[in-house]
Amino acid sequence: MLKLRQLQKKKQKENENSSSIQPNLSAARIRLKRDLDSLDLPPTVTLNVITSPDSADRSQSPKLEVIVRPDEGYYNYGSINFNLDFNEVYPIEPPKVVCLKKIFHPNIDLKGNVCLNILREDWSPALDLQSIITGLLFLFLEPNPNDPLNKDAAKLLCEGEKEFAEAVRLTMSGGSIEHVKYDNIVSP
């Protein structure tokens, strides 16, 4: 009986200590931490934590950098960086995702805005960081000309895959199309 009481007190003390470690973390930050803990990244994706969800400072929202390096498709050998900015209502609202490189892609505009349905109308709190990263990878394997942010890229993809592939190769190495200079995103 004495042993049972000691175990109970020990467990209570552990619970008090663990709950006092992160008392100020919001539900959004706790969820993001859980997403990060369960993340299973493919070898073509790298993730860097810019602002940790562990920070109790609510003036700085959690930020991640995701680097996608497609190993097939039009963007093979590219290295594309994205910022993911999580607000305090995540997962009710999706994070703000911005491409940090100027690339020629039907679903990414010149300012870096990303058109991905799961980041807009198809977002659900059931989706997580793994879903977002999978969606970003999919954008490079299957660009969608039917829902474009870059209408020139979408038009070229619809007109012919060969011409689109040539334009992507040109722009990936820092070339220009229609007086727009694109960033060199070719992996060394």
Curated annotation (Swiss-Prot):
The acetylation of Met-1 is cotranslational, and not regulatory. The N-acetylmethionine increases affinity for DCUN1D1 by about 2 orders of magnitude and is crucial for NEDD8 transfer to cullins. It is an enzyme of class 2 (transferase). InterPro entries: Ub_conjugating_enzyme (IPR050113), UBQ-conjugat_E2_core (IPR000608), UBQ-conjugating_AS (IPR023313), UBQ-conjugating_enzyme/RWD (IPR016135). The modification N-acetylmethionine is found at residue 1. Disulfide bonds: none annotated. Pfam families: UQ_con. Its EC number is 2.3.2.34. It comes from Saccharomyces cerevisiae (strain ATCC 204508 / S288c) (Baker's yeast). This is NEDD8-conjugating enzyme UBC12. Residues 27-177 form the UBC core domain. GO terms for biological process: protein neddylation. Gene3D superfamilies: Ubiquitin Conjugating Enzyme (3.10.110.10). The active site is at residue 115. GO terms for molecular function: ATP binding; NEDD8 conjugating enzyme activity; NEDD8 transferase activity. Keywords: Acetylation, ATP-binding, Nucleotide-binding, Transferase, Ubl conjugation pathway. Residues 1-23 are annotated as: Disordered. Belongs to the ubiquitin-conjugating enzyme family. UBC12 subfamily. Interacts with DCN1. It catalyses: [E1 NEDD8-activating enzyme]-S-[NEDD8 protein]-yl-L-cysteine + [E2 NEDD8-conjugating enzyme]-L-cysteine = [E1 NEDD8-activating enzyme]-L-cysteine + [E2 NEDD8-conjugating enzyme]-S-[NEDD8-protein]-yl-L-cysteine. Accepts the ubiquitin-like protein NEDD8/RUB1 from the UBA3-ULA1 E1 complex and catalyzes its covalent attachment to other proteins. The major substrate is CDC53/Cullin. Residues 1-12 have a biased composition (Basic residues). Pathway: Protein modification; protein neddylation. One of its GO terms (cellular component) is cytosol. PANTHER family: UBIQUITIN-CONJUGATING ENZYME E2.
